[in-house]
């Protein structure tokens, strides 16, 4: 086809290459171009702390058809090998993280290059620059470090990370001895340094941990006690009056000391706080749930405070003598001083005024507070009223309140009787005992002011739904004259205690000095333990009177200066149903509730008598077969109960180093079931009225319940008066709930007339 053309001189042949080339190209098939491999690494830059800091990296390889991933290498101008750091793996699949750990010391220069190289195509790679920060320790702190919380409630927790790398913050977790995962609680509203911890539904001790994102080996934890306590709704915690809160998980024998426990805040009131503060959880007020502490004052006021808020948050407060609460024009609290001796004989036993004295009681099903007020007008007309207060608003739930006056009377010839009737006297009768709520009836008891005659002991039942007096539910302890005695007495005051209630609804209380003839068929029960049946009104079911009753009466040695406690049933013991109480003579009588013993002039028909050696103005605590009580001028004492013999040891099992002056102490006890029990007691010696030896701060004490010689803390220990309380009030009782202890005081008796002190675990 083609001819070769050659030159003879150069032997050169010319070939038409263009045509040949076109022919070759036309004969080669076309192949599609391959996609190129690419590598990227994230994050693109990082700072990692030397000496333990870590950072995850991920290489992404695109178009790697054989899925061979990458190989990782480290290099640096100022380092080599492990001095540049270490890797958790030297190769990885695309998208699989590896962890870089910084070297112990930062190189110089403090930059390391981390390179990911494609295995399929080693020409394809990507690098990131890692800055190694100095080995200044990263540390995590958490706030609060300790605290208390009710089940299902939330607590704001915050973390601070010192020398945090890249402001990475923390992650949150919760743990506990008997839980895992979500059953230990959950977290909401989470940020890099804060969260709301939501407690689980089970009570216990939980730990919240904040873990550094930049260095997972660094973390901080706290301890939160979560309680399922339904409330402190009545005097001494429950109707048995045993004074125990066994649902306390925040306050332990390890956590209560002057380094971690102290005064958190105070709430001022308009008058002295004689009644025990009451605590109720998860109460909705104005659409917001609160744990609430309720306080009553002698200035006729009720306060509802947020039980946890610092500084103090008053949710509402009301006066029980304004028109909205049944008061009339010109009514005031009853002045203790001045002309006319409006309170007793005018000696100022309760000073400077009388308004609300007895501890109220709460019905949690209706959120109702039952409380009795006492007032007077300018005409010296005296008023006592039973109020049913809506705890969500402070308003009267049942209006008007129930007047308690001379329209209530019993047949009798006793002191102050007229025409064969003894009428209730709102002037002379002192509503000192705590109120009782049992089976839909509110029971209220009275004694005297300063033994000012004529007076009697009264117990009256009111329908909780209507406040109307219950038919036949009126008891007078001394309705009839005995011999030629001009007085009756027999007041029910019990050092501010409250009648106890057993599982059958029977009421138990102790009367003070007064006339007695029940042993001869009479109806007078001075200086006696009385058991009232409540099935049909009120009726005496049984009683016990000491053999020396006549001497007790003649010498004002009240049996009823202290109150009774119903003990836990002893089904396998010699006596299944027991009661204990004592008075000014210093004898604690252990009684059979099914057969109290009545009266014998030759012997006391009791299970056991323990001579404390000191007058008793207290309600004993009973916990895990141990009794706790403090007489006047004596230490707090622990007596161990022997379940086999059904009796207490005659000598104290342990006692405190501290002695309590007049009036002794009614303790309270907190525990986590059968462990971490703490006995709390107030030294109210300097209670500021004319009969007191002085005026000064009440002192709160905390003891290990297994050995009272071990004092854990008291409010006078910390420097600079950090934990000092307001002035003492005679007979007051501490309330323990949800990691806090609430104490009513009289403020400083000048610029502050009343104050609630709130103690608890110091948050930091």
Give residue spans per PLM region.
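Proline-enriched interdomain boundary motifs that mark the N-terminal boundary
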Residues: 35-43, 136-144
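Short, solvent-exposed loop/linker segments at the N-terminal edge
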Residues: 46-53, 147-153
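Short, well-ordered beta-strand segments
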Residues: 65-80, 128, 166-180, 220
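Low-complexity "stalk/linker" and mucin-like segments enriched in Ser/Thr/Pro/Ala/Gly
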Residues: 75-101, 105-106, 174-194
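A short beta-strand micro-motif common to beta-rich folds, especially ectodomain repeats
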Residues: 108-120, 203-213
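Short, exposed coil/turn segments at beta-strand boundaries within extracellular/luminal domains
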Residues: 119-126, 213-220
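C-terminal edge beta-strand
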Residues: 126-132, 220-226
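Mobile, glycine-rich extracellular loop/lid and propeptide segments
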Residues: 227-570, 576-598, 617-639, 665-670, ...
